[in-house]
């Protein structure tokens, strides 16, 4: 595989709402971060089956991208950074304890702690249960609960990354196709597991549930402008943007972003022909 720096495709578009139609959104996880999405291990790809028997979850996304028509552009962006455990100073912790109850909020925990708490609750090891509680002695986990515990423990055992996913569909009015929006928003459904899934962030989606929510259209115009600017700047983790990221581990990231295998082919996305050769004898080391 040869990796080269690609030209920034976002610089080729000057967004003008009078000439270009735009639809976009950000994605987040439906459940708490420790609950995993469906990964390549769940698809059985780690068993190294023959190419013709592989079911690569990224295939449907590539097929969709290959199906868009003339004058249409679909952008998909995944931003990551190494997850840092959330640390607070002592005085801030005490302040949060004071205001937590009246406002019904909760202090943010790091990813591993959150996952361990989920497991502890399911194992009846949290503070609400005492050691001499007869309920614990009679407690038997169901098969589904055991699988959930194993999945969460497997997820938090791997390095986590703060993640942001953003998608945009652009086209001139004559080429704008609503069915392309459906395909774009459905391109992450193959990662849905019994525990978690991707879902659009309503306040970051360029749409409103009812006309009365934006009668003049000014809020929608502002959302589109903001989403486009955030996309081209790869903005997300800075505090000023006030967007809560979620966490995916290395297994999950490798599932949603990887080089597609040779079995994934589409007529409109041809592969570059290449062959392996020995390195030149004068290659500096």
Task: Label the predicted regions.
Residues 1-285:
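Extended, folded cores of ATP/NTP-driven motor/assembly subunits in large transport
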């Amino acid at each position: 595989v040869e990796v080269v720096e690609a030209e920034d495709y976002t610089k080729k578009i000057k967004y003008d709402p009078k000439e270009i139609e735009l639809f976009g959104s950000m994605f987040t996880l439906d459940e708490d971060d420790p609950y995993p999405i469906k990964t390549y291990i769940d698809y059985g790809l780690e068993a190294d089956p023959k190419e013709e028997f592989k079911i690569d979850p990224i295939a449907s996304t590539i097929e969709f991208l290959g199906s868009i028509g003339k004058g249409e552009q679909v952008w998909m962006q995944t931003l990551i950074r190494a997850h840092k455990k959330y640390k607070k100073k002592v005085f801030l912790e005490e302040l949060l304890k004071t205001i937590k109850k009246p406002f019904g909020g909760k202090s943010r925990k790091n990813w591993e702690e959150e996952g361990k708490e989920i497991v502890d609750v399911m194992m009846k090891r949290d503070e609400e249960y005492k050691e001499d509680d007869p309920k614990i002695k009679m407690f038997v986990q169901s098969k589904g609960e055991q699988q959930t515990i194993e999945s969460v423990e497997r997820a938090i055992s791997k390095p986590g990354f703060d993640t942001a996913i953003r998608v945009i569909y652009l086209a001139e009015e004559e080429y704008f196709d609503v069915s392309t929006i459906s395909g774009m928003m459905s391109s992450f459904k193959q990662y849905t597991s019994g525990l978690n899934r991707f879902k659009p962030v309503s306040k970051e989606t360029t749409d409103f549930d009812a006309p009365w929510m934006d009668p003049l259209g000014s809020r929608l115009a502002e959302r589109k402008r903001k989403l486009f600017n955030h996309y081209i700047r790869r903005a997300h983790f800075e505090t000023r943007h006030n967007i809560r990221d979620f966490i995916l581990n290395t297994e999950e990231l490798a599932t949603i972003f990887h080089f597609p295998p040779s079995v994934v082919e589409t007529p409109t996305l041809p592969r570059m022909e290449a062959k392996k050769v020995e390195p030149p004898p004068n290659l500096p080391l």
